[in-house]
Amino acid sequence: MPATMVLTAPSLLSSSALIVLAYLIGSIPFAVVVSKLMGLQDPRSYGSGNPGATNVLRTGNKTAAALTLLGDAAKGWFALWLARALVPELSWGAYALVALAVFLGHLYPLFLRFKGGKGVATALGVLMAIEPWLAVATIATWLIVAVFSRYSSLAALVAAFFAPVYYVFGSGAAWHARLEVGLAIAVISALLFYRHRANIARLLKGTESRIGKKK
């Protein structure tokens, strides 16, 4: 069997450690941390109750919302960057699991009793680490839908739908797609839809709040 196919105990341990570390990084609740540092209400106590940038924006504090967005995106990127920095020979399968772990950490954070955000910014950070141009295409999709609809949730859903599509069809032209990574992106997209199920119901009813509107 080729050496690259052998999973040694040290490699399994390092991969497992990176996955756990990624989950813990994803668990950092930037919406709560930023709000507390800036003297704002806990984002879980108003609006949608979601500890994310869109809900923080409902306070009217754009700086706090921007810092939350950057923090949530940065942790998605950082977890994958750190994994490669610590273990350069990390397999693509383990890399994909690290991507899922940091995303799940945001959705179900240890530090907030497993009640986290919806994961849009963290997902974008993950995409930025995987392929910067993939992230740019996904962000552009979000911006176009958000500008014309003023619905953050609708923009997130459309962007989530197209992210794995972009990854597959961009392969060969802009990057080399990996099956394991593609599956991770697809799972992240599916989880984004699941986390937005209440938003989907409100969009269908016409009761969803628009960007910047206080509830």
UniProtKB/Swiss-Prot annotation:
Record-level Gene Ontology MF annotations: acyl-phosphate glycerol-3-phosphate acyltransferase activity
Tree of life domain: Bacteria
SMART domains reported in the protein's UniProt record: G3P_acyltransf
Locations listed in the record: Cell inner membrane
Membrane topology: Multi-pass membrane protein
Assigned EC number: 2.3.1.275
Catalytic class of the enzyme: transferase
Pathway listed: Lipid metabolism; phospholipid metabolism
Subunit record text: Probably interacts with PlsX.
The protein, known as: Glycerol-3-phosphate acyltransferase
Organism: Bordetella pertussis (strain Tohama I / ATCC BAA-589 / NCTC 13251)
